[in-house]
Every structure is written in structure tokens, then in C-alpha cells.
Amino acid sequence: VLIVTTPQPYAAGVAVRAGSLAVQTGQRVIGVVENMSASVLADGTTLDVFGSGGAEAVVSGLARQSVSTTVLGHIPLTPLMAQAADNGIPLVASHAQDPAAQELSRVADALLKLTARENRTLPLSPR
């Protein structure tokens, strides 16, 4: 299971509960991604619209429950990301140099590496 959160503490708390539920149902949490993270503005300053540290809070919260996982990335909130989403166009295809697109690509690469080592079936059976 890939846990996605935002920087806000409440969202991180919900994400910890989702990760805990995943583990209780026999699934593994392969990583945490923070969406809507800080953006770096043209003048070099950082804009944390929704705060920061949500992904790290999820990893810490899961660790307190003996669940080991890692932060795979922080997807920044960018104007092009919102525009691409509104138009139904994948950001990585339309604006590959956008910081959000670059981070999405890094997260995808990390997921490929993590899942390529596994060929597992879910521990589920029909009723």
C-alpha cells in the first residue's frame, strides 16, 4: 500500500490510521508520499501553503506501531500541476520540467524499484 498524505497534521493522522489498517489486513506499507508540499517560488523563497512535515509524521506514527516505512517523495503544489489536472492532462507528459512532474517521476521510479523485487499476491481469498 502506498500512503499519500498532505502536510496538515489531521491528514497525517488519517494516513497513519490507513497504514495501520493496511497492516492489520496483511498488507505492507511500501512508502509515504506527501502531496501539496511546499513550492519554491521564482525568487527562491519557499511557500508552505499547507504547512510541512506530514509525510514524516506518518512515518513516525507508523513506527510507533512497529510499522517500518519511508518517505518516497514530496510533491510540491505548483500552478502547472493544478492546470494540468483541471484539463485532464498528465503533468509529466505536458510539463516534464515542472518541479511537481520531476518529483512524481522520482516517486514512480522508487515505486518501480520497490515493486520489481516482489511478485506477491494479496493475502485475500474469496468468501
Name every feature range the model reports, one short phrase each.
Residues 1-74, 79-83:
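Conserved catalytic-core segment of NTP-binding enzymes
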Residues 16, 30, 96, 119-122:
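Residue-level detector of alpha-helical recognition elements and their boundaries
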Residues 26, 112-119:
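Secondary-structure transition/hinge residues
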Residues 85-102:
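C-terminal boundary of histidine-terminating zinc-finger modules
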Residues 99-114:
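Acyltransferase
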Residues 106-110, 119-127:
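A short, charged, Gly/Pro-tolerant segment at domain boundaries
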